[in-house]
Curated annotation (Swiss-Prot):
It catalyses: uridine(54) in tRNA + S-adenosyl-L-methionine = 5-methyluridine(54) in tRNA + S-adenosyl-L-homocysteine + H(+); uridine(341) in tmRNA + S-adenosyl-L-methionine = 5-methyluridine(341) in tmRNA + S-adenosyl-L-homocysteine + H(+). Transmembrane segments: none annotated. The lineage of its organism: Bacteria, Pseudomonadati, Pseudomonadota, Gammaproteobacteria, Alteromonadales. InterPro entries: MeTrfase_TrmA_AS (IPR030390), MeTrfase_TrmA_CS (IPR030391), SAM-dependent_MTases_sf (IPR029063), TrmA_MeTrfase (IPR011869), U5_MeTrfase_fam (IPR010280). GO terms for molecular function: rRNA binding; tRNA (uracil(54)-C5)-methyltransferase activity, S-adenosyl methionine-dependent; tRNA binding. It is an enzyme of class 2 (transferase). This is tRNA/tmRNA (uracil-C(5))-methyltransferase. SUPFAM superfamilies: S-adenosyl-L-methionine-dependent methyltransferases (SSF53335). It comes from Shewanella woodyi (strain ATCC 51908 / MS32). The keyword Disulfide bond does not apply. The gene is trmA. NCBIfam families: trmA_only. Dual-specificity methyltransferase that catalyzes the formation of 5-methyluridine at position 54 (m5U54) in all tRNAs, and that of position 341 (m5U341) in tmRNA (transfer-mRNA). Belongs to the class I-like SAM-binding methyltransferase superfamily. RNA M5U methyltransferase family. TrmA subfamily.
Amino acid sequence: MNLAAMDPNTYDAQLEEKRIKLENIFTDFDTPNLEVFSSEQAHYRMRAEFRIWHDGEDMYYYMFDKALNSKVRCDQFLPASKLINEMMPALIAELKPNPLLRHRLFQIDFLSTLSGEILVSLLYHKQLDEQWETEAKSLKERLASKFNVNIIGRARKQKLIFDKDFVVESLQVNGEQLQYHQIENSFTQPNGKVSVKMLEWAIDVTKNSSGDLLELYCGNGNFSIALAQNFDRVLATELAKPSVESAQYNIKINKIDNLQIIRMSAEDFTDAMAKKRSFRRLEGIDLDSYNCNTIFVDPPRAGMDPDTVKLVQGYERIVYISCNPNTLIDNLVELSKTHKITRFALFDQFPYTDHMESGVFLERK
């Protein structure tokens, strides 16, 4: 974290630097004009994590500033949502005078939504007993007078929930409301409004598609749910169990009837498609019945392994969302042999950082 860079007055200049940098990285590829999707300049981040510093009777949130090589007190945090910033002082005011709740508390995590829900996770270097549980329930009741809040207590091999360990986000995507179950301690897109822009871009680039869609690394179904409208059927894979459970929840609450989620890794699915191995998790699913002309991938920072790249090359159209331009470039070296980039986008998910979220749409040459 570099607090000095978090200046709304310099946001446009920083975004322009990212645009230039991304275009320069892609100079070896024939790309169309870069579409740039900006972020709000403040209060854009829907989740935040803070360490807690104890100083006598005082206690406060802090982060580590790499530029200063020191901890920095954070009574407020410009990137965090307005809801998180409202909760921060209210929560500290409750914790400070309460010995049971503050003792050995070392971290607080917040997960908020654009729809007004907030989840607070209190992390401890001690086991949580019945007395702590009683105080935590009272804390929730007091905060609930002002906030739509739930609380989690975490310690080694302990997780106590009052009353939910998830939030339900509501996003307006092209004028339609989509709801997403987001569970504590699992991946969700941090920048809610930029996430909407990413969904709308993905819907736009696939709007004239035919047949079915295959998605690898689908998470909680973030893109699958939104893209289901453009395809006859959607088949999606995800390895993390909490994300798969959230995806199934999201299918139900959004009343999607053409989306099937499979819990398996992209690598295993690649083997299944190549008929190298059989998997019990695929029983009852006829992969050959799918007519997938389009594939959507949003891989981890490491990008796709060579076998998955080869699998992806077998599809007419590829939508690739990347959180790491360098591994995207590595994958595009192979993908560009068979496909041409016809759409190219930069999504500013993480303002005031060097991080660049990008998207490419490729079509077979």
